[in-house]
Amino acid sequence: AFQGMALTKDGKQLDGLKVLLEEVERANKFGFTAVELERAKAQILSNLEKTYNNRDKTDSEMLVGEYVNSFLEQEPIPGIAWEYQQTKSFLPSVSLEQVNSIVKNYVKYYSKVIVITGPKKDGLVQPTENQVLKVMDEVKLAKLTPYEEKANIANLLKPFKSTGKIVKTETDAKLGTTTLTLNNGVKVTYKKTDFKEDEIVFTARSLGGSSLASDADFVKAQFVFPALAEAGVNGFSKTDITNYLAGKQVSVSPFIGNLTEGVNGKTTNKDLGTALELIYSYFTGLNYDPASFTAYKDKQSAMTANMLSNPQFYFSNEYSKFLQQKNPRFTNIIPLTEDWEKADYKEAY
């Protein structure tokens, strides 16, 4: 069955339902674009290739899952080698017309179930059946336009002449590591392992973190730090970058901790260059986009708004506040409404 889901603030369920139904109807009326299809194909093949390359070191839980499905659902277990080769063989032949026709078969106006959930609060009115039906009718009559694909990113970075040099190389025979010292003082330590056939895991950090901020600035910025990457880099939005990375195995996550700042991530041999470009971009080309922070804040607020009504969370939060008495850098274990009111995106940036 076809399913869709939207997460909204309290009292905004009907707005969320309308947006969700509009996007479903847009796909139903106009279908997906050729670029979207090729991006999806590339991602499917990239994920299968990664699993295939590590087929001799598959985690047990993945194997157990297949065995359980085979026993309970009589699902075949041909193995990743067969799945990868077969997918490589038939996936290119899947046409846009086939995909769009399947969407039309899935999206129907009859036999539809809509479930709306929300907290019970004084003054908060839940949507009625008639209101839901009205939204559905409005979407049916809405004059929607096809999704327009933006131009893809050709290059994440503009060409530039690198002045970086390796000024020192050291090895540690006991640890099996090699350390490269660069002319800017950065030290790069790497070690070859056989844990995975095609995986590079990395972390980069420097001392400092949020400890360098004053107590007053920290309170304004602490919950904004995770949102900074939402703005994208080098003038490209996060959506642009996500599309650019389709078909690549690249994960890069910048962070600012209490005592350190840096990036964590992983990639593959062939995508290492892209991962390094993204790391460089986070350091040198982070976008300033207050609108992206507002969207992030609204999304986080919707998820956490009702957590204090959970007895277990309420106890954990109050217990933490008790332990952190007179600590000017502690507010709550997760950002609540009063924390977002103090948040200052410009200060954090």
Place the predicted regions along the sequence by residue.
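M16 family metallopeptidases and their MPP-like homologs
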Residues: A1-S93, S111-P119, K196-A229, V233-G285, ...
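Proteolytic maturation boundary segments
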Residues: E38-A42, E49, N69-S214
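Peptidyl-prolyl cis-trans isomerase
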Residues: V94-Q98, I102, N287-Y288, F293, ...
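Non-catalytic, conformational "gating/processing" segments within enzyme and secreted inhibitor domains
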Residues: S111-K112, Y345-Y349
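Short beta-strand/turn micro-motifs at beta-sheet edges
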Residues: Y190-K191, V250-P254, A348-Y349
